[in-house]
Amino acid sequence: METKLPPASTPTSPSSPGLSPVPPADKVDGFSRRSLRRARPRRSHSSSQFRYQSNQQELTPLPLLKDVPASELHDLLSRKLAQCGVMFDFLDCVADLKGKEVKRAALNELVECVGSTRGVLIEPVYPDIIRMISVNIFRTLPPSENPEFDPEEDEPNLEPSWPHLQLVYEFFLRFLESPDFQPSVAKRYVDQKFVLMLLELFDSEDPREREYLKTILHRVYGKFLGLRAYIRKQCNHIFLRFIYEFEHFNGVAELLEILGSIINGFALPLKTEHKQFLVRVLIPLHSVKSLSVFHAQLAYCVVQFLEKDATLTEHVIRGLLKYWPKTCTQKEVMFLGEVEEILDVIEPSQFVKIQEPLFKQVARCVSSPHFQVAERALYFWNNEYILSLIEDNCHTVLPAVFGTLYQVSKEHWNQTIVSLIYNVLKTFMEMNGKLFDELTASYKLEKQQEQQKARERQELWQGLEELRLRRLQGTQGTQGAREAPLQRFVPQVAATGGQS
């Protein structure tokens, strides 16, 4: 009887075993972008590896693994692995249907066997297993036909060979998770070259493939201790090329999710290598255009670092202020959400180091004409822990934001924002009424002085304009006086015929 693959076999981001949960994107950015641009239609692509070879041998069904005696099991397993190494053309839906079905049935059987049968993974089958996996998954990814591909709006190019490829990934995953799996044997085949090719597959446009790759790479990182430093190094290279060269790599979110779990397991004190990764890679990642695709995972990694070492807070906040978006309001909302997550875990001793520059930026966000940016900034005062930090440092935070709050409360076009500002001002008044009154008086005096200077400036310009007009009139009068004798002289010359 044919063994079916369980429908729940595809790993998903929140429920992938061994991966730390990542905050949902709506916690960071509660204002989804709605675009009127029509999503581009999905087109079929095929990797170069899956081009059909007309001279390939026709597949015939082999006996079921469960029907053969134990003495013949491993020989039949090797034959089935070789059978599953035959590739088919999935762009032609009707080509070699029998062979495709034979391979699919064999893959289903292998998945079931390696997941439930003990003693099947002996040393001689390891090279056959890795060879079959490599032949199926390692391929040249097709270039995207759309250079302006937007993962949020455009349909990805799905892998046509997924009916077979999914089963190969599922087999690989169960192979790594099997109780009989021996890393000491597998490390001869799962080496640095294998890992590098595995990482290159993260650029696949098919999100189903990237989900499997994420879980598999995490298992490889956990099983092969000797490859851990190499995996981190190659991830660094991918991120740096993404930031400074191409700004295109489809698997950034998945790699960051893996790294979030890895960071969570870092031993203390943190190594210099890990701190440099935060400062030189994670912080500059905030500058790329496609930040919204992976920001939730990136923010999670940053917060994980700060929970490990609070002294990194100042570097992180100043880095965020350095890359703070100037023209993209959607990114501003995401930055504000990440700052709130950081403030949720910040130590009071670290808060005093960044409070002034941070809340000056928050004040600029409050004054934004885009109401979502202003609203997101004002929501800081709804967070009890942040409010307690502000109250303890009211003498610094209040002067940094008071002028902006007072002015925007009089001028902002959105009444919701005005109401929120009134609530914030009321909170400040209750925190420190004396300081609030002093700042109010100082603000009004400053405004009066500004108005006085504006009047003086206006009077000065008005006086200069009057002086210019008088000089202009005086010049015209002098010119008229000089021209009068000449006008009297011209008729006399005409009367004498020009003779002296």
Curated annotation (Swiss-Prot):
Residues 1-19 have a biased composition (Low complexity). Residues 34-45 have a biased composition (Basic residues). GO terms for cellular component: cytosol; nucleus; protein phosphatase type 2A complex. It holds the Pfam family B56. Keywords: Nucleus, Phosphoprotein. InterPro entries: ARM-like (IPR011989), ARM-type_fold (IPR016024), PP2A_B56 (IPR002554). Residues 1-55, 474-500 are annotated as: Disordered. As the regulatory component of the serine/threonine-protein phosphatase 2A (PP2A) holoenzyme, modulates substrate specificity, subcellular localization, and responsiveness to phosphorylation. The phosphorylated form mediates the interaction between PP2A and AKT1, leading to AKT1 dephosphorylation. This is Serine/threonine-protein phosphatase 2A 56 kDa regulatory subunit beta isoform. It comes from Oryctolagus cuniculus. The lineage of its organism: Eukaryota, Metazoa, Chordata, Craniata, Vertebrata. The gene is PPP2R5B.
